[in-house]
Amino acid sequence: DLANELSRNGRRSGLTFAPEGGSERMRKVINKMVTEEDLIRTVATAYGNGWRQVKLYFMCGLPTETDEDVLQIAELARRVIETGRQVSGTRDIRCTVSIGGFVPKPHTPFQWAAQLDHETTDARLHKLRDAIRADRQYGKSIGFRYHDGKPGTVEGLLSRGDRRVGAVIEQVWRDGSRFDGWS
């Protein structure tokens, strides 16, 4: 059993899972064949074996994504906490939702997909944050981390641009920028 093997040394700090799409519909779009029930069964095993924290990684701005797809992340995190409390017998369960913006990359199935503007990405993430905070029963057990959308726009330009982007990078450097906001 993988959960037992991972915790054999007694350390159970946390496990990370990457459903990536907020809804099953989105996971099908990106060909990530993990159902909600698969994930719930997996976190139940983790919590049942003594783990107290899981992290769920998602992307926002995927092709065909809607606000509702993103808001499904709050419901999934709620189910994770509920399941963890049931199988562990304790309320001391945490789930951190971490979200990065989708950046189309060359030589991938979505290389020609449009990148969502950062204003829309940020608006969706603020709605999600508010939905998590509004959950009186589970919200305090759900952490929420996301990256501002602007650096993702730059990443999209750098990853899909051609040699002409070099002149832009040089000019930005001459103007005094040094990877500001990148870590």
Protein language model regions, located:
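A glycine-rich phosphate-binding loop feature that marks nucleotide/adenosyl-phosphate handling sites
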Residues: 1, 59-62, 90-104, 143-158
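Conserved SAM/AdoMet-binding glycine-rich loop
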Residues: 1-94
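Short glycine/threonine-rich loop-to-helix capping motif typified by GTGT followed
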Residues: 2-5, 64-73, 106-118, 151-165
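Intrinsically disordered or highly flexible coil/loop and linker segments, enriched in small
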Residues: 48, 86, 90, 108, ...
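Long, polar/charge-rich, low-hydrophobicity segments
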Residues: 78, 84-88, 111-122, 127
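Structural alpha-beta junctions
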Residues: 81-82, 126-142
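Acidic, Ser/Thr-rich peripheral helices and adjacent loops at domain boundaries
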Residues: 115-129, 165-177
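Radical SAM enzyme core and accessory elements
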Residues: 134-183
